[in-house]
């Protein structure tokens, strides 16, 4: 698709995809503008003087998320750099390719794009692992030697000792950055991260026609060797309340059918791993679906449109879509609540189809990174499955898939197979070129050998395992929502639960009429209630904002006072009073 930009330099067209970050689109545009344009002052709007947004605020959102369509025109405004900066001191985009793999050497450091707050916070930390003075130390209490000096956050022995399977993303990033950008390199800079791309280059102009009529060593992808990814983008999944999971599982308990949902929350520091990140789950939203005993079906277009609306409303609450969760449960028939253990080391953990689903979701939710030459790297989107463990208990398992898995799926190189633990390698066609694919394994003699992956290979090579849990009961949780149950969840009509005025009256009316503001705050601080009230279109935009502030903010008293005095809220209470 093409997006048009009108500026004082004229009109420019930028080619992009729906899932491209807006920051990436702007990077492509900058090369066509005046070199003196100050990127930090970029603003865009649809009409002159209306709805002006700073580009830095939109950089980490996708083209689709912004609602942009093919041919849309945006007005770009910016200021020129001061005279003392026109020599190029602050230019961020210019880069030069230095080898055939596409590693780019920048003169002035990382890209200037907005990252997540947790990434900005962890970037400032060194992550060093402290060590106590040992018997080998020969110095005093104030001294330090090689036996007690802090370890780097990627230290292998520390992770093995503490049974941490993968190093954190920021530990991995610092390790790469330390090797790629040493002080002796002077002002030159090499992006330590680069997204793998296994697609054939159909725009190669190296003296031949494009694929499938021609091919050369520059446009065809190299042979791929799969291996376990050493890092993970997210280290831990934390569910703020156990009620969230219990209510989600209730759907299976009532119907015996499986259930799927999207998790909403945020990302924050995880202290149990050096420079770790945890995904904090505040709520689960279940899109429209038809549940079955061994799976479920969904209308993809219907779910896509509905989730775009939910994403916007969740964003107003300070939440984003951070993962997906689904059940795979079968009652063991013992009458004690036990379930079958289907997923284990001798069967599979995630099936090949589930791995492909996870990879597609991760590519739709890219992780913004100024240290990547593309402006993004992998994803923080997580996948959780609720199934039976070896003891027959209901348990949660959390995963991500590797950057190699994302690239394989994007290049359409793999598909599901009849064996859930194996991914089938697709054949080369006019649309795709599939190179040789290998994976490393230990043979019967314990020697690591390289195996040809065709026609299929174990999907475990694409998995990254995460830990999960709940906040410590000893410490106060900072959950955004006081209540997770009481008001029906969306799209549960098949279970005999529906969101309507009767349910809303049963849940809210008596409290709304009582004058007890503390209890009213507890009631409205419910993710599903907020979404339903918004769908009624009774409250004005300002009143909706007051409702959100009353529900999710720590200092909610003033906002709630204004809300209950508003015309929209009083209209809602009156409708509930008159409803049957």
From Swiss-Prot:
UniProt keyword Membrane, yes or no: yes
Annotated Gene3D superfamilies: Phosphatidylinositol 3-kinase Catalytic Subunit, Chain A, domain 1 (3.10.20.90)
Outcome recorded upon mutating residue 323 to S: In npl4-1; nuclear-targeted proteins accumulate in the cytoplasm
One GO term describing the cellular component: nuclear outer membrane-endoplasmic reticulum membrane network
Membrane topology recorded in Swiss-Prot or TrEMBL: Peripheral membrane protein
Family annotation (CDD domains): MPN_NPL4 (cd08061)
Keywords for the protein's UniProt record, in alphabetical order: Cytoplasm, Endoplasmic reticulum, Membrane, mRNA transport, Nucleus, Protein transport, Translocation, Transport
Cellular compartments annotated: Cytoplasm, Perinuclear region; Endoplasmic reticulum membrane; Nucleus membrane
InterPro entries registered for this protein in UniProt: MPN (IPR037518), Npl4 (IPR016563), NPL4_C (IPR007717), NPL4_Zn-bd_put (IPR007716), Ubiquitin-like_domsf (IPR029071)
Record-linked Pfam families: NPL4, zf-NPL4
GO biological process: cytoplasm protein quality control by the ubiquitin-proteasome system; DNA replication termination; endosome to plasma membrane protein transport; ERAD pathway; mitochondria-associated ubiquitin-dependent protein catabolic process; mitotic spindle disassembly; mRNA transport; nonfunctional rRNA decay
MPN domain span: 237-377
Domain of life of the organism encoding this protein: Eukaryota
Function: Substrate-recruiting cofactor of the CDC48-NPL4-UFD1 segregase. Assists CDC48 in the dislocation of misfolded, polyubiquitinated ERAD substrates that are subsequently delivered to the proteasome for degradation. Involved in the import of nuclear-targeted proteins into the nucleus and the export of poly(A) RNA out of the nucleus. Required for the proteasome-dependent processing/activation of MGA2 and SPT23 transcription factors leading to the subsequent expression of OLE1. Regulates ubiquitin-mediated mitochondria protein degradation.
Subunit structure: Component of the heterotrimeric CDC48-NPL4-UFD1 ATPase complex. The CDC48-NPL4-UFD1 ATPase complex interacts with the HRD1 ubiquitin ligase complex composed of the E3 ligase HRD1, its cofactors HRD3, USA1 and DER1, substrate recruiting factor YOS9 and CDC48-binding protein UBX2. Interaction between the complexes is mediated by interaction between CDC48-NPL4-UFD1 complex member CDC48 and HRD1 complex member UBX2. Forms a complex composed of CDC48, NPL4, UFD1, DOA1, SHP1 and deubiquitinase OTU1. Interacts with CDC48, UFD1 and VMS1.
Other notes: Present with 1050 molecules/cell in log phase SD medium.
Family: Belongs to the NPL4 family.
Protein name: Nuclear protein localization protein 4
Organism encoding this protein: Saccharomyces cerevisiae (strain ATCC 204508 / S288c) (Baker's yeast)
């Amino acid at each position: 698709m093409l997006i048009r930009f009108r500026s004082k330099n004229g009109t420019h067209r930028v080619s992009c995809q729906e899932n491209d970050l807006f920051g990436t689109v702007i990077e492509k545009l900058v090369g066509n503008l005046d070199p003196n344009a100050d990127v930090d002052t970029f603003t865009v709007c649809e009409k002159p003087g209306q709805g002006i947004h700073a580009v830095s605020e939109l950089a980490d959102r996708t083209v689709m998320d912004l609602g942009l369509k093919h041919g849309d025109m945006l007005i770009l405004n910016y200021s020129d750099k001061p005279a003392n900066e026109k020599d190029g001191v602050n230019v961020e985009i210019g880069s030069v390719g230095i080898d055939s793999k596409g590693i780019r050497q920048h003169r002035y450091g990382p890209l200037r794009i907005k990252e997540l707050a947790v990434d900005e916070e962890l970037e400032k930390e060194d992550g060093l692992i402290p060590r106590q003075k040992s018997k080998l130390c020969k110095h005093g209490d104030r001294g330090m030697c090689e036996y007690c000096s802090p370890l780097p956050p990627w230290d292998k022995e520390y992770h093995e000792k503490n049974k941490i399977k993968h190093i954190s993303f920021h530990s991995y990033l610092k390790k790469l950055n330390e090797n790629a950008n040493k002080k002796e390199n002077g002002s030159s800079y090499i992006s330590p991260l680069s997204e793998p791309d296994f697609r054939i280059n159909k725009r190669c102009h190296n003296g031949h026609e494009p694929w499938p009529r021609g091919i050369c060593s520059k446009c065809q992808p190299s042979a791929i060797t799969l291996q376990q990814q050493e890092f993970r983008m997210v280290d831990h999944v934390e569910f703020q309340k156990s009620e969230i999971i219990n209510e989600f599982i209730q759907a299976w308990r009532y119907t015996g059918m499986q259930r799927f949902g999207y998790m909403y929350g945020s990302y924050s520091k995880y202290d149990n791993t050096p420079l770790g990140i945890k995904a904090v789950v505040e709520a689960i939203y279940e899109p429209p679906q038809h549940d079955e005993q061994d799976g479920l079906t969904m209308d993809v277009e219907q779910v896509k449109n509905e989730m775009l609306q939910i994403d916007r409303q969740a964003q107003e609450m300070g939440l984003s879509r951070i993962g997906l969760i689904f059940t795979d449960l079968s009652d063991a028939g013992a009458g004690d609540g036990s379930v079958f253990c289907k997923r284990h080391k001798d069967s599979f953990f995630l099936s090949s189809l589930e791995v492909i689903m996870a990879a597609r979701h991760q590519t739709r939710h890219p992780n913004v990174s100024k240290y990547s030459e593309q402006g993004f790297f992998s994803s923080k989107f997580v996948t959780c499955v609720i199934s039976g463990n070896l003891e027959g208990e209901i348990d949660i398992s959390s995963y991500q898939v590797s950057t190699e898995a994302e690239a394989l799926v994007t290049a359409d190189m793999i598909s599901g197979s009849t064996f859930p633990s194996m991914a089938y390698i697709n054949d080369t066609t006019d649309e795709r070129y599939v190179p040789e694919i290998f994976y490393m394994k230990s043979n019967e003699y314990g020697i690591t050998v390289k195996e040809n992956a065709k026609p299929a290979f174990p999907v475990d090579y694409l998995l990254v395992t995460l830990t999960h849990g709940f906040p410590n009961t000893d410490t106060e949780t900072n959950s955004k929502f006081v209540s997770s149950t009481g008001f029906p969840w969306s799209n549960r009509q098949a279970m005999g639960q529906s969101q309507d005025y009767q349910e809303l009256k049963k849940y809210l009316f008596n409290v709304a009429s009582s004058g007890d503001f503390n209890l009213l705050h507890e009631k409205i601080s419910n993710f599903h209630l907020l979404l339903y009230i918004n769908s009624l279109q009774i409250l004005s935009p300002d009143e909706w904002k007051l409702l959100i502030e009353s529900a999710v903010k720590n200092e909610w008293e003033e906002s709630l006072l204004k809300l209950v005095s508003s015309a929209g809220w009083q209209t809602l209470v009156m409708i509930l009073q008159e409803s049957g």
